[in-house]
Amino acid sequence: MKIKVVDMPYEQALAQPREKHTPPRRPSMLFRALLRALSAPDLRATHFRCDRVGMERLGPDEPCLVLMNHSCFLDLKITAAVLYPRPFNIVCTSDGFVGKAGLMRALGCIPTRKFQPDTALVRDMLYAVKKLKSSILLYPEASYSFDGTATPLPESLGKCVKALGVPIVLLRTCGAFARDPLYNGLQNRRVNVSAELRYLLSPEEAAEKSADEINALLADEFSFDNFRWQQENGVVVNEPFRADGLNRVLYKCPHCGTEGETEGRGTELICRDCGVRYRLTELGALECENAEAKFTHVPDWYAWERACVREELEQGSYLLDAPVSICVMVNFRQICRVGEGRLRHDANGFRLTGCGGKLDFTQKPETSYSLYADYFWYELGDMICIGDRDVLYYCFPQGNGDVVAKTRLAAEELYKLKRAERAAKNG
């Protein structure tokens, strides 16, 4: 999938009119049927099946909140099939509306800015379930998994569940990540995909629980490990490109400690600095071919990288300072490519400068619990996004080495550290 991009001077981009808020629309039966029909070929190719658990508790015309894990673009096609003919609105990233806002609204999409405060979102969701009598599809992780494990959930989720006052349904997929992991550059593998659609909480059950209790329940439901699932279920991925781009996730060599010198190509991940070589097996495990393996499991390696980043933050040595190509979004007409600059990230948060000295934007560490970061974003490149309600800045690192995953890890760990500091200060 691509996105409309226009070259434009920075001042001209910022001078564009802002997008006016528009209430959600209930998707028509025609669009629901069309989306289902368009989804059918890919689902047939994956021999898709869905198990339904407790769904007899949900009335045929009763709106609900569907919470789904987010693995790849196939997720939406799965939802179109398993929820049909039930009408549902989809909470999606605002840049998905660029160049096609009318179509997205007709499909029932509700735009939101990832990892940015959005007070209008809950109002739109309430409008959908109360006025439109439509269900809501929400990906609470708000981003694709890098390493095949769950990403953090927002603390506001429990409050949102209670505010909506509708049944909560969980849609969990298996095989979608193994078929199309984000790091692998949109190369689909031959993997069967399945899902479970499960009635989780009635409105009455949700009302009896505190927001914190609901958060704990959902955190448990969204704990998963796709690589472990692949190994335990003997799911074979024998494509010769299965390790392509794995360096985007495993960017730091555990043997020599060098960052940005790993390279995933074919079935192997190598370190160009020390020469260590790993093979990603057909079952998704790691085998070291010329040394004693430090890790045999991709998520364990990624967790080690997270621990290393946290240690850097605690010691005050963490720093990202990278040249970037910069795009901005101020409305749904287009993404504006505005020039070059530098993105700095340290204990004080983000600072983006550039466009001949005209751009100087900062974002504090406490702004969000995570970071909008993506690989091969709309086929433009690996991307880090910061911003506010007015403007979103899409930064594409231009230097050597993979910095996107580390930056997201750092943003998440820095948020935790700042929250802990504030809690300690307040007693």
Over which residues does each language-model region extend?
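A broadly conserved sequence feature marking short terminus-proximal activation segments
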Residues: V191-E259, R389-D402, T407
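Soluble catalytic domains of membrane acyltransferases
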Residues: P27-F31, L43-A216, E232-N233, P240, ...
